[in-house]
A protein has these predicted regions:
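Conserved acetyl-CoA-binding loop-helix of GNAT-fold acetyltransferases
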Residues: 97-100, 106-119, 145-146
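Conserved active-site alpha-helix within GNAT-family acetyltransferase domains
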Residues: 111, 123, 135-147
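Conserved GNAT acetyl-CoA-binding A-motif
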Residues: 114, 121-132
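Conserved beta-strand in the GNAT
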Residues: 61, 67-76, 94, 99
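A short helix-loop-beta-strand connector motif used in the catalytic cores of GNAT acetyltransferases and
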Residues: 46-61, 94
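A short beta-loop-alpha structural element at the N-terminal edge
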Residues: 2-28
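Conserved GNAT-fold acetyl-CoA-binding loop/helix
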Residues: 23-47
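Conserved acetyl-CoA binding element of GNAT-fold acetyltransferases
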Residues: 83-102, 132
Length: 147
């Protein structure tokens, strides 16, 4: 198992993992607000990777036997004018995507990915890390509470 920075040769596997993540979210979405748009697979990875690049972020991949089994994406959080009016706005990293393939969960891969992203955020002076998790994502909430 190794954690590496994203390389373009893994784009198709990243697309597959993001679809797996969205399918999971759809399966637990109590409000039925999520959807898997026909263009999701082809566009979401590109949009996520552009966001990472534009916002001083990183994408790390967990590789096992030359197969991508997990990924994490994170960026430097941006603030708008409203934020500055009522918030101190510390330098903050934001985890935007985290998925470990269902076949390889419960092996510590998610923690390895989080640790790698935490190292990166610390290296660029972030004081905090944020992540948004749907309230109905009990597995995700449980994972982050352990971190």
């Amino acid at each position: 198992m190794k954690i590496i920075e994203y390389e373009d040769k893994y784009l198709e596997e990243v697309k597959d993992l993001l679809v797996e993540l969205e399918e999971y979210i759809l399966s637990i979405d109590e409000d039925n607000l999520d959807q898997l748009h026909p263009e999701y697979r082809d566009k979401m990875a590109i949009l996520d990777l552009e966001e990472v690049k534009e916002n001083n972020g990183k994408c790390y991949l967990a590789i096992d036997n030359n197969v991508v089994v997990g990924l994490i994406m994170g960026c430097l959080r941006s603030y708008d004018e409203y934020d500055y009016l009522d918030y101190k706005c510390p330098r903050c990293g934001e985890v935007t995507e985290l998925i470990v393939s269902k076949k390889t969960r419960s092996k510590g891969i998610g923690s390895l990915l989080m640790n790698k992203m935490e190292e990166y955020f610390k290296s660029i002076g972030c004081e905090y890390i944020t992540i948004d998790v749907f309230a109905y994502n009990k597995i995700g909430i449980n994972f982050y509470e352990k971190q």
